[in-house]
Amino acid sequence: MIIAPSVLTADLADLGNACSEAVKSGLNWLHLDVMDGNFVPNLTFGPPVIAKLRKALGEEPIFDAHLMVMNAEESFQQYVDAGCNHISVHAEAVKHLHRCVTAIRDAGASAGVVLNPGTPVEAALEVLPEIDLVLIMSVNPGFGGQSFIPNVETKIRKLKQAIDQQVADGGRPVQIQVDGGVKAHNIAMLRDWGVSNCVVGS
């Protein structure tokens, strides 16, 4: 299982050093929570900060950008150019999801779809052959420190079944990532459900 620390847990005044220490410890998949103050109430960082972080850390770390922004189809290229390897967009915030994830992959990044707790899994299933990752939010996005929502189990299991069938039919494998309330006491449970990537610290 991939453990992806959320960079928002770091002191943003010392972000480069904090991320460097994470990478040195073997945690080279870094989760970047990008918030625009519109899709979610909070505001974090954008492409200029990410580009500086990439320059400081080099090419080794995987930058996994979770775009909590409106109209991500109009801005994702900036994050690819800044050095992000993975770009995940919210199904609720993109007008043409299939077109958006296809454009992300055409730009050279892996594409992901994010599902809020209240968003049905079918939103991701519609584009499953075109994506590399589904990020299931197990808290409501935009704020840290929330408790894990356990009823995401049904969504995860349904998604895992669809991915397994897609692979059996010769299609692409798709990672299941979970973000929100992931702790030592529930990470084994998530793995048993079929999760392959956990964001921690959010």
Which residues does each predicted region cover?
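Short secondary-structure boundary segments
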Residues: 34, 91, 115-117, 138-139, ...
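Conserved N-terminal beta1-alpha1 strand-loop-helix module at the mouth
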Residues: 1-88, 92-96, 103-111, 124-131, ...
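Predominantly soluble domains enriched in secretory-pathway, periplasmic, or organellar proteins
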Residues: 101-103, 119
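C-terminal alpha-helical cap/extension of soluble enzyme domains
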Residues: 165-168, 173-202
